[in-house]
């Protein structure tokens, strides 16, 4: 089965009289445009997103018919939670994490990142309130360079030059 786009969110579908099958993925697989996986019920799934910037989210429906529905399930993992005491501290910790080019998630006014012992110790030593938790990382901050084309017409420089004409 080849999937080219997301059908919608699970809450938008009536699952009555349908088998709900889950496609389990790790948080870092949610941004991959091309991948092959097996659902929990053994269905082979090939994801081939044609548009750049498409990302799988927890409970996205990637296939639906009258009998079955396949839903994305982002697997929980060990994570670092930083609970900023103020908006200024939120900005500082996001800057520090982003400066190290680490993946960062914002959920429930907390900053989360995949657990790595050295990063946990560094954040704690820097005075931030940190905890190690087992949770689902779902709301990634788009802090890195966006996917882009390699043709001349898609470069930012080319677009600015066209505006200036």
UniProtKB/Swiss-Prot annotation:
NCBIfam families cross-referenced by the UniProt entry: PRK13261.1-6
GO molecular function terms listed in the Swiss-Prot or TrEMBL record: nickel cation binding; unfolded protein binding
Lineage of the organism: Bacteria, Pseudomonadati, Bacteroidota, Flavobacteriia, Flavobacteriales
Presence of the UniProt keyword Cytoplasm in the record: yes
InterPro entries: UreE (IPR012406), UreE_C_dom (IPR007864), UreE_N (IPR004029), UreE_N_sf (IPR036118)
Source organism of this protein record: Flavobacterium johnsoniae (strain ATCC 17061 / DSM 2064 / JCM 8514 / BCRC 14874 / CCUG 350202 / NBRC 14942 / NCIMB 11054 / UW101) (Cytophaga johnsonae)
Gene Ontology terms: biological process: protein folding; protein-containing complex assembly; urea metabolic process
Protein name: Urease accessory protein UreE
SMART domains per UniProt: UreE_N
Segment forming the signal sequence: none
């Amino acid at each position: 089965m080849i999937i080219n786009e997301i059908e919608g969110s699970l809450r938008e579908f009536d699952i009555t009289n349908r088998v709900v099958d889950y496609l389990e993925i790790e948080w870092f697989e949610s941004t991959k445009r091309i991948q092959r996986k097996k659902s929990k019920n053994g269905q082979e799934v090939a994801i081939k997103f044609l548009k750049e910037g498409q990302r799988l989210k927890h409970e996205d429906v990637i296939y639906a018919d009258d009998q079955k529905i396949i839903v994305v399930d982002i697997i929980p993992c060990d994570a670092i939670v930083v609970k900023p005491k103020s908006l200024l501290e939120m900005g500082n910790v996001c800057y520090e994490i982003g400066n190290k080019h680490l993946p960062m998630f914002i959920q429930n006014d907390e900053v989360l990142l995949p657990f790595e012992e050295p990063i946990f110790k560094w954040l704690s030593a820097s005075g931030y309130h940190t905890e190690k938790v087992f949770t689902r990382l779902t709301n990634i901050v788009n802090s890195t360079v966006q996917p882009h084309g390699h043709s001349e017409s898609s470069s930012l420089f080319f677009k600015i030059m066209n505006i200036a004409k």
